[in-house]
């Protein structure tokens, strides 16, 4: 079919959106390169999978797949509210936190409005901005992370929404409690601030600012989190936002009916009751991060210190060629930018010890080959 058939009918701000490119699936790499062993370190997934309790809960509910889910996720909201020490009316659930990030843009911004986000930020922020016809204000990064002072200075009377991520994806950088408090105090009360904490469980920094602690003081703050990462429920697509009741009520007006499937609800409920699994996940991540960063240092490779479950390593102008060579070795990692200095980095998700070893052996082989000396 011709691509131009309906081009004139599509809204201009929609036709300009670049399609989000996820990490390559294992099956695609196996098919393309005829490989049996694959280590997927591209999508920041939990290498341990899901909690055994969550798996068991899902298995016990498979018989009910013919029924619609609870449209309000009543029991999950109750459990999540208890876990977070919030009220159920202060929580909105989404089909992945991506859905909620997009909904917030649809609720608060439109043509003529401005949405602020950082350079080197999660692609969904800019996509959501374009989708509602708003103007994206991308503030240059500082040391690969958010320049909060510059972001505060970028606020105008057209600003409706600000997206922040702490830790940031894809760079893994973190801003401190002091930096956060200085920033949020400068934001006008009519500007919505979305604080994306998808990787909060992995943080080890002593000066991390937990967004939940600021919700009462700042009614314009929305905290976004997910079950996809530390809880290992990426396949089931479930995330949540926490904010004051009024903001949550607007999100619930716009979210699709039955947006959280039944299996996701029961899995998330069970996952909340397995804190030891999350601890095991975080401990494994800490160990894996130490292993990879030590390897990079031994090889003389620069990397961005990360507070997530991934790390970006600088492989120079040949990074995309190295990425292709890694694929041929059965290792899937993630290029992070099409151009500029950041395009010389690859993002590596922390895997199981044997997956990390697979990556390091493959990269070492590539870097010592005649093609890359």
Swiss-Prot record:
Superkingdom of origin organism: Bacteria
SUPFAM superfamilies the UniProt entry points to: PLP-dependent transferases (SSF53383)
Pathway(s): Amino-acid biosynthesis; L-histidine biosynthesis; L-histidine from 5-phospho-alpha-D-ribose 1-diphosphate: step 7/9
One GO MF term: histidinol-phosphate transaminase activity
Entry keyword set: Amino-acid biosynthesis, Aminotransferase, Histidine biosynthesis, Pyridoxal phosphate, Transferase
Chain positions with N6-(pyridoxal phosphate)lysine modification: 229
Annotated InterPro entries: Aminotrans_II_pyridoxalP_BS, Aminotransferase_I/II_large, HisP_aminotrans, HistidinolP_aminotransfase, PyrdxlP-dep_Trfase, PyrdxlP-dep_Trfase_major, PyrdxlP-dep_Trfase_small
Cofactor(s), names only, from the UniProt record: pyridoxal 5'-phosphate
Biological processes per GO annotation: L-histidine biosynthetic process
Pfam families named among the record's database cross-references: Aminotran_1_2
Disulphide bridges: none
EC numbers on record: 2.6.1.9
Catalysed conversion reaction: L-histidinol phosphate + 2-oxoglutarate = 3-(imidazol-4-yl)-2-oxopropyl phosphate + L-glutamate
PANTHER family with a match to the protein in the record: HISTIDINOL-PHOSPHATE AMINOTRANSFERASE, HISTIDINOL-PHOSPHATE AMINOTRANSFERASE 2
Similarity section: Belongs to the class-II pyridoxal-phosphate-dependent aminotransferase family. Histidinol-phosphate aminotransferase subfamily.
Assembly, per entry: Homodimer.
Stated name of the protein: Histidinol-phosphate aminotransferase 2
Natural source organism: Hydrogenovibrio crunogenus (strain DSM 25203 / XCL-2) (Thiomicrospira crunogena)
């Amino acid at each position: 079919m011709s691509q131009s058939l309906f081009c004139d009918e599509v809204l201009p701000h929609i036709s300009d959106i670049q399609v989000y490119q996820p990490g390559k699936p294992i099956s695609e790499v196996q098919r393309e390169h005829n490989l049996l062993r694959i280590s997927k370190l591209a999508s920041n997934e939990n290498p341990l999978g899901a909690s055994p309790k969550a798996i068991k809960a899902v298995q016990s509910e498979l018989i009910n797949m013919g029924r619609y889910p609870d449209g309000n996720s009543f029991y999950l909201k109750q459990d999540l509210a208890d876990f977070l020490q919030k009220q159920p009316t202060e929580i909105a659930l989404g089909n992945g936190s991506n859905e909620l990030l997009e909904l917030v843009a649809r609720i608060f911004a439109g043509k003529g409005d401005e949405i602020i986000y950082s350079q080197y930020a999660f692609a969904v922020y800019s996509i959501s901005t374009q989708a509602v016809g708003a103007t994206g204000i991308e503030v240059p990064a500082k040391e690969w992370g958010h320049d909060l002072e510059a972001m505060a200075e970028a606020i105008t009377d057209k600003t409706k929404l600000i997206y922040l991520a702490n830790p940031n994806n894809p760079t893994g950088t973190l801003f401190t409690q002091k930096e956060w408090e200085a920033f949020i105090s400068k934001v006008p009360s009519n500007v919505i601030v979305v604080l994306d904490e998808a990787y909060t469980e992995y943080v080890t920094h002593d000066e991390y600012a937990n967004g939940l602690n600021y919700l009462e003081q700042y009614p314009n703050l929305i905290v976004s989190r997910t079950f996809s990462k530390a809880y290992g429920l990426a396949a089931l697509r479930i995330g949540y936002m926490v904010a004051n009741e009024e903001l949550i009520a607007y999100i619930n007006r716009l979210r699709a009916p039955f947006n959280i499937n039944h299996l996701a609800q029961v899995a998330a409920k069970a996952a909340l009751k397995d804190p030891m699994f999350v601890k095991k996940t975080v401990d494994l991540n800490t160990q894996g991060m130490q292993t990879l960063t030590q390897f990079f240092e031994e090889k003389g490779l620069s990397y961005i210190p990360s507070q997530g479950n991934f790390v970006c390593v600088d492989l120079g102008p040949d990074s995309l060629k190295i990425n292709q060579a890694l694929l041929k070795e059965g290792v899937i990692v993630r290029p992070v930018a099409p151009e500029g200095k950041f395009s010389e980095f690859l993002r590596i998700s922390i895997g199981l010890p044997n997956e990390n070893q697979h990556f390091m052996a493959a990269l070492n082989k590539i870097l010592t080959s005649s093609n890359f000396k």
